[in-house]
C-alpha cells in the first residue's frame, strides 16, 4: 500500500497555491540570457504560458486583447514574462528566432520570452492550457492563476473580448 501511495504522489502534477509564495525558476530567454523569477524581486510579475498554435492564444493576439493587457501591465510597473513549454517536435515549439519574430509580428510587449522545453516550470506551476496566466505581487506572492478573462469557449470573438472581465487586469489593480 505504501508503494502505491508513493507511486500516486510521484505522478500528481505539482501546482502553485494562490496567496502562497511563488516558486522561483530560471529559464533561458529568446536572446540566450538566463532569467530567473527572483531577478524581479520587488516587482509585480505576470507569467503568460503560451503556444502560438493554440487557437485561443491566436484569438487573444489577433484581436489585440493580449497586447492591451501587456500594455496595461507595463503601465502599472509589472514585468511580463511569456513562457513557452512546448518540447521539440511538439505543437507550439519554436526556436529563438521564431519566438522573436512572433513577438515582433504580433506587436507583443513581453519583457522576456522564456523557454521551458522540458516543461519543468510548467509542471511546477500547474500550467495546463494556453494562455494560462499568473500574477505574482512585489512580495513574491502568487495573487492570481487562471484564464486571462471570462470570454473563453469555442465561439468567443472580439465582441466577447471587449465585454470580457479581464482577470489579469483585475489582479493587477489589487
Question: Where in the sequence are the language-model features?
Answer:
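Short, internal strand/loop/helix patches
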Residues: 100-137, 142-143
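Structural recognition of the beta-strand scaffold that forms the well-ordered cores
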Residues: 45-48, 79-84, 112-115, 135
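A short beta-strand-turn-helix
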Residues: 25-45
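Short active-site neighborhood of thiol/selenol oxidoreductases, capturing the structured segment around
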Residues: 38-58, 172
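N-proximal helix/coil linker or "cap" segments that precede and/or mark the start of modular domains
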Residues: 8-24
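Structural microenvironment flanking redox-active thiols in thiol-disulfide oxidoreductases
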Residues: 58-106, 117-122
Amino acid at each position: 500500500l505504501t508503494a502505491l501511495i508513493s507511486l500516486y504522489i510521484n505522478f500528481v502534477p505539482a501546482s502553485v497555491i494562490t496567496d502562497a509564495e511563488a516558486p522561483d525558476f530560471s529559464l533561458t530567454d529568446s536572446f540566450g540570457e538566463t532569467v530567473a523569477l527572483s531577478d524581479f524581486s520587488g516587482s509585480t510579475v505576470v507569467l503568460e504560458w503560451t503556444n502560438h498554435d493554440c487557437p485561443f492564444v491566436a484569438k487573444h493576439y489577433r484581436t489585440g486583447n493580449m497586447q492591451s493587457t501587456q500594455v496595461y501591465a507595463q503601465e502599472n510597473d509589472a514585468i511580463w514574462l511569456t513562457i513557452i513549454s512546448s518540447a521539440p517536435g511538439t505543437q507550439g515549439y519554436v526556436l529563438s528566432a521564431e519566438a522573436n519574430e512572433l513577438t515582433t509580428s504580433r506587436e507583443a510587449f513581453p519583457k522576456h520570452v522564456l523557454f521551458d522545453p522540458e516543461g519543468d516550470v510548467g509542471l511546477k506551476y500547474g500550467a495546463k492550457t494556453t494562455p494560462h496566466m499568473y500574477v505574482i505581487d512585489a512580495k513574491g506572492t502568487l495573487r492570481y492563476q487562471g484564464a486571462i478573462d471570462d470570454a473563453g469557449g469555442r465561439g468567443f470573438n472580439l465582441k466577447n473580448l471587449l465585454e470580457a472581465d479581464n482577470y489579469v487586469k483585475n489582479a493587477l489593480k489589487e
